[in-house]
């Protein structure tokens, strides 16, 4: 009786509008049929809180909105402004190209709408089993565009454009990302040409995303290096606010162009190796790289000339001395490329035999590629001031010339001019974070995918940044923070977390070592919170956060959604879960699988799908040692019992396992699409 009452209530909930759901839930008895009452005892049932999580529609639907995403308007004009104006319309040929990864439908007629049965629910299912794996794959694997549509739509027939953009931003991608240009162009064209411009049906959505489907699928499947990017950025914002309270330090004033910056300026930008972006504070204010350019020009020199040639002229050791000392090592070479003497020598190695104008253009083009074509400028006023107040650097230059540290035929005065020019190159926190991410990504720019630097150049650059990048504070920074970094007198700190992300922290007030006060505090706090230190143990860490791991909440939701789809007989939802490489054998707290629930409810289509398409183990035991066959027999579902019995001859039991080994082949096929 309880079971009939619960089923009727569920139907009522699904048919009522959202406004009526709350009142029904308050009157409702707990849904007991998801975890059946065992024979000979009782079992805990889910409360209202669990019920509200069973389906996104009950909890309000949608994704958590991050900062900057919540206020996005749904009006066509403001969405157009968000997507950017202008741009070349996509070619007609692009609109008609085949969907990547698409396969022909298993049978004619509309499929995939929530609640409908698929090919496994009719006589065609038997033909598929007889025909083998090929047709099963066709039934299991519709196009990736379909999967993406249903992931965002959450049961609706159309997707509002602003909802898609908000969901996209929550993954860390930006609408200005060069990799998404075709998608954004098509969205803009759709908004301008359709009558219902702010809504996308499935066909329009597929046209918009098909050229960028792999990247978008990775984003929404949370396959980026930082899966829960919204949670990570909330931590970054907290660290930013903590560092903002730091006072002290003095703005560099040896030239007027540096002295004019307000000590209250403070910005942090993050770019991961997958192109996830986050910025907070004064991240669009241009400032000069100053000494932050030293590792970049060293990387250019090694990329062009090789390690062996470059280190004929400059060493690799920390000097233990001030960065502008007139001092060489025992071989009469500068100690490393991060002190002024070494940086001047490295400058002389770039594009030898070419005039300064061509050299400067070459380096600017290189830095533009590293920054993904984001802002890289030049401050002529800073250059003039540096040259006029550069007596110490001229002294170092003449000392190097006297010790024959330059390649033969080098014009020392011309090289110093070029050196001052490179120090006067301007960036913003946002563009510099992409440069740092290029170093973190092995020389590939994360937002363009272009290889800019060789692996050798990246490895050597990060090694020297780690040991020599923070002036006289380098040893302490390596000890406490343990990450490659380079600071500059303009207040910037270029920070690299190898294989994860790059960051630029900028605040003009400097400590007595010449490093940004707020930037140093931020870096210390970051490594205290996250296990990014070079020697943090990734397997046995106790208290630190690892943003590279997916949180437990997502796994809990995964189990709830899987079992609820099996309970309601929603084969379309199960197909989407299988497409997203979900473990279809995962269990709840009673060790019950989706097959247990489907067998108890008598959903023939779901049982067939799980057995024939997903190849799940038909013999899992729950905490009461009941198998799906026991469930079907107990509730009188003889057709399900017969299917499970027949499937025994096709399946070799692997034992009760929680790791979903029976799904490995399907998972490999799914991941192969990406």
Curated annotation (Swiss-Prot):
Give positions of region: Highly mobile activation loop.
320-327
What this chain does, per the entry, is described as:
Catalyzes the first reaction in the primary pathway for the renal catabolism of glutamine. Plays a role in maintaining acid-base homeostasis. Regulates the levels of the neurotransmitter glutamate, the main excitatory neurotransmitter in the brain.
> Which effect does the record note for changing residue 391 to K?
Abolishes assembly of dimers into functional tetramers. Loss of enzyme activity. Forms oligomers with full, phosphate-independent activity. Forms dimers with full, phosphate-independent activity
The phenotype of cells or organisms lacking this gene is:
Death during the first days after birth. Pups appear normal and display normal levels of activity, but their activity is disorganized. Pups do not orient to the dam, do not succeed in grasping a nipple and do not feed properly. In addition, they display altered respiration.
Q: Which reaction does it catalyse?
A: L-glutamine + H2O = L-glutamate + NH4(+)
Q: Does the keyword Nucleotidyltransferase apply?
A: no
- Look up the EC number in the record and give it: 3.5.1.2
Give the start-end ranges of region Disordered: 56-123, 652-674
Annotated HAMAP family: Glutaminase
Inhibition and activation profile: Isoform 1 and isoform 2 are activated by phosphate, due to increased affinity for glutamine. At phosphate concentrations above 10 mM, isoform 2 is more efficient than isoform 1.
* Gene Ontology, cellular component aspect: cytosol; mitochondrial matrix; synapse
Q: Which residues carry this modification: N6-succinyllysine?
A: 135, 169
Protein name in the entry = Glutaminase kidney isoform, mitochondrial
Residues with Phosphoserine modification: 657
- Bias (Gly residues) occurs at 58-71
Q: Where are the ANK repeats?
A: 590-619, 624-653
Q: Where is the transit peptide?
A: 1-54
> Which positions does the record annotate as the modified residue N6-acetyllysine?
316
The root-end lineage is:
Eukaryota, Metazoa, Chordata, Craniata, Vertebrata
Q: Which UniProt keywords apply?
A: Acetylation, ANK repeat, Cytoplasm, Hydrolase, Mitochondrion, Phosphoprotein, Repeat, Transit peptide
Q: What are the BP-aspect GO terms?
A: chemical synaptic transmission; glutamate biosynthetic process; glutamine catabolic process; intracellular glutamate homeostasis; protein homotetramerization; regulation of respiratory gaseous exchange by nervous system process; suckling behavior
Outcome after substituting residue 316 to Q? Forms dimers with full, phosphate-independent activity
> Domains: what does the record tell us?
A highly mobile activation loop at the dimer-dimer interface is important for enzyme activity. The C-terminal ANK repeats prevent the assembly of the supra-tetrameric filaments.
